[in-house]
A protein has these predicted regions:
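One-carbon transfer enzymes
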Residues: 1-241
Length: 241
């Protein structure tokens, strides 16, 4: 087992969670517990795409999405449990699980669009979320594309969650170079840059068991991006070299 930190990894069975687990392993860290959230697979549905890789010089770990999440979790987690037929983050069993084990930190890697309920955030345990976007300037779910169009790079921000979307205190943030043409943006690049910042944050937490400094978000600087027109999305992809 790698060097352990008292953390619960609250993980959807997703490409993002795979990237997080793999970078934790690569960084020589581990977590005390993982709670894996597995949705019931609908009949006739396919597995998520593994994403296209490409040669790059980004100097970050690219996830191998062909590796099952459970395989990496077994390597990084002292103990893990699974919720089968997962129906949503408001499941009372999740709150009970967190209350029982009382980790010092929760890494939240839920399914897209999920908001951690106030009851869970009120447990007095910090929930760490890695947002793809340089906060407060880029809020929402399509920030990778708008950031590429506007600035030619992409930002990532580590925040401690509050009930409001993307509105928590900033632990740290960083801008990353644009990916090369041909690299899958949604499943590879986006998750890789999030995971890279997560590694940095967990290394700090492992040393101090706390975050010593925060940046408060300035609402006057914020912009929210949810929907992107297919033409704009295509232009963002074409901008890559």
């Amino acid at each position: 087992m790698n060097k352990q930190v008292d953390i619960l990894f609250l993980a959807a069975d997703s490409s993002r969670s795979k990237a997080y687990a793999q970078v934790i392993q690569h960084s020589g860290l581990s977590v005390s517990r993982t709670l894996l959230l597995k949705k019931k697979k609908a009949k006739g549905t396919n597995s998520p795409p593994c994403g296209k890789s490409a040669s790059h010089d980004l100097k970050i770990v690219m996830p191998d999405l062909k590796i099952p999440l459970i395989e990496t979790v077994e390597q990084i987690s002292d103990k893990f449990d699974v919720i089968e037929n997962y129906g949503g983050i408001k499941n009372s069993g999740i709150i009970e699980y967190i209350s029982t084990h009382r980790p010092k930190l929760v890494i939240f890697s839920g399914y897209g669009g999920e908001l951690v309920p106030k009851e869970m955030l009120g447990l007095g345990i910090p929930f760490l979320h890695i947002h793809s976007g340089f906060l407060p300037k880029y809020r929402g779910s399509t920030t990778v594309y708008y950031s590429l169009l506007n600035e030619g790079n992409c930002g990532v921000t580590a925040i401690l969650l509050k009930p409001e979307i993307d509105n928590g205190d900033i632990v740290t943030r960083r801008k990353y170079p644009a990916p090369p043409s041909g690299l899958d943006l949604d499943h590879i690049y986006d998750n890789a840059i999030r995971a890279d910042l997560l590694s940095e944050v967990l290394t700090e937490w492992n040393e101090n068991q706390e975050f010593k400094e925060f940046i408060k978000q300035d609402e006057s600087e914020s912009e929210t991006y949810y929907v992107i027109h297919p033409v704009l999305k295509h232009l963002a992809i074409l901008s890559l070299r």
